[in-house]
Amino acid sequence: METIKKNEVKTGKVIDLTHEGHGVVKVDRYPIFIPNALIDEEIKFKLIKVKKNFAIGKLIEVISESDDRVTPPCIYYAKCGGCQLQHMTYRAQLDMKREQVVNLFHRKGPFENTVIKETIGMVNPWRYRNKSQIPVGQSNSNQVIMGFYRQRSHDIIDMDSCLIQDRQHQEVMNRVKYWLNELNISIYNEKTKTGLIRHLVVRTGYHTDEMMVIFVTNGATFKQSELLVNKLKKEFPNITSIKQNINNSHSNVIMGRQSMTLYGKDKIEDQLSEVTYHISDLSFYQINSSQTEKLYQQALNYAQLTGKEIVLDTYCGIGTIGLYMAPLAKHVYGVEVVPQAIKDAEDNATKNQLKNTTFECGKAEDVILTWKSQGIKPGVVMVDPPRKGCDETFLTTLLKLNPKRIVYISCNPSTQQRDAQILAEQYELVEITPVDMFPQTTHIETVALFVRKDEE
């Protein structure tokens, strides 16, 4: 094999992309991964890390460009770790994401006949985030900086704009940054674990335009909070809630468990279809509201509700998808391990006068067995777990429940594919639809339909 040495400069042709969007060049059979390179490009690159089984390269020059290459519109793209695909046309991004799902499911397990649909994309794949979590720090000259982390680090890149964030969030960020400097409010230092302001979090209701601003602080004492509240109220009249979240932990967790309302309401409202949701500072709510409606509509299509079905919504959170389906179901049962989320789900059901809903707090595998013993037989089960996927205990319990259809929403197709192999014992994985919830990034969301084998 040809010798591979660190700091060596080489040329080669990109033959594939990794799940991180990195170009793959092979020397003999040895893979080299190069960020920002595209398939079929002839490139010059420098080897910056060499391991036994792979190497990492840095792109120096594109000798022969792909038709899929575009100039990234963001001035921070080369440094910021928030986006990975701005150098790629949006059509190519959608194709890449579908291809990754195809590779996962058609090459592993009994899923070669599963239909993988085209990725559902956005008309305008920018400014889509309804929630911004912005780290706060200080420069070497002790000026307040706000932005996002440099790739693979906790170094904050001071930014005035971000093209995937809501435009209003940027305006709030820039004004708060100015006021923190003006008022000389202390900023949290990750190394010394001292200082007050850790993060600024902004949430907006996509359909209501209500805005919530959250100051995440290292401790409860926030002497100048009233000054900041008054400035925000005056400059941004659509702010309906300002909160302080206390996070004393010395970890990468952004928000703590304790919050207090400094101004306005405890929650903001948003709508999906005809359903209104109350969203708190700690609520899980999909980041991309317009794509969430497409995601949930596809899930609804797979569920094929006629009004006679009992629906079980596992990992239900604040009830978003269960309440979305409730108007078309006989009854919706939701289960979630987080007590506050269940309270929010019940409040949301009451707000929308959806009386055909029941929510219970507990582990899904325990609660659904209790419901089964009470004679509750769901025809459709909704599954929407965190990135780690489903616990095996839950999946084996789900097989005992034996519903006709399972609709599985995933933010991590790798764990979805792992879980699908367990469900394949009794279910046919009929179809998967990727939905692009996070344009310009490598993240993929999918919704999959499983049908009981005796129902095919």
From Swiss-Prot:
Top EC class of this enzyme: transferase
**InterPro entries linked to this entry:** MeTrfase_TrmA_AS (IPR030390), MeTrfase_TrmA_CS (IPR030391), NA-bd_OB-fold (IPR012340), SAM-dependent_MTases_sf (IPR029063), TRAM_dom (IPR002792), U5_MeTrfase_fam (IPR010280)
What is the recorded name of this protein?
Uncharacterized RNA methyltransferase SERP1435
CDD domains per the UniProt record, alphabetical? AdoMet_MTases
Keyword DNA repair among record annotations? no
Q: Which family does it belong to?
A: Belongs to the class I-like SAM-binding methyltransferase superfamily. RNA M5U methyltransferase family.
Which positions does UniProt annotate for [4Fe-4S] cluster binding?
C74, C80, C83, C162
Q: Which organism is it from?
A: Staphylococcus epidermidis (strain ATCC 35984 / DSM 28319 / BCRC 17069 / CCUG 31568 / BM 3577 / RP62A)
What PANTHER family does the record tag this protein with? RNA M5U METHYLTRANSFERASE, TRNA (URACIL(54)-C(5))-METHYLTRANSFERASE
